[in-house]
Amino acid sequence: MTTFLKGRAKYPQFRKKGINEKFSLTNDQFKLIGKKIKIPNLGWVKLKENLRFNGKILNATVFKKGGKWFVSLGVEIDHLPKLKAKTHKSVGIDLGITDLATLSDGTKIQAPKPLKQKLKRLKRLNKQLSRKQKGSKNREKAKTKLSRLHYKISCIRKDFLHKLTTGLVRQFDVICIENLNVKGMVKNRKLSRVISDLGFHEFKRQLVYKADMHGKTVKEVGRFYPSSKTCSCCGFVMAKEDLTLATRRWTCPNCKASHDRDVNASLNILNKADKVLTLS
């Protein structure tokens, strides 16, 4: 309301019940002792874990996700986390659909693709929900079941990406990636579900903030650079019609070097990435 009165926002709207259920509290509105939090009009509620950081508690946001309630606490800390040891190693990463990440050292990493695994169950629960009467308790139960499955899919994806990005930041000092047009890729109806399932944007987000935390560097190559079609040995660029997406291995007509398409792309990304995304 304050921002509306100052002319910085539109007239506020009421949040509908059951949609994005959450509320915020300032540090004088709640109390935190060990694994318990005191919330106004609710009293003491048990928490699953203790506060992870020591510092001044600023605020709390209580929200519902996947049929469960969570609290997110904002904490002001005095010191930064311990930096990861320097390894003096660099790597280029080519993101793809068959293999989520191909590293310039030849390593190929496959993603779990949780949406693909749970798709049949997801369709079944969606069908069950559509058949329930609006406003009924059975519809609420069906909605909760569907919400829990969506949350589980999201957790599997994020857990895998957290482990992957943490490993990369621990192993390399300089990480080079490509600037993918994820929004444009999602518009392709044949690829949209697969792209969303892999989590390209989330991978980049995690990689950049973790590299910032530990004094590592993330670089990016422009999205129009032909990393797959350029020979990493001599720089010869193949014509688009001579190198289709179905071609996974190719031989450079100029220097006769044989390439794995994705490994070659990751080597080019390592050599050509120049835009620094991190603060370090």
What are these regions (language model features)?
Residues M1-S280:
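Nucleic-acid substrate recognition interfaces
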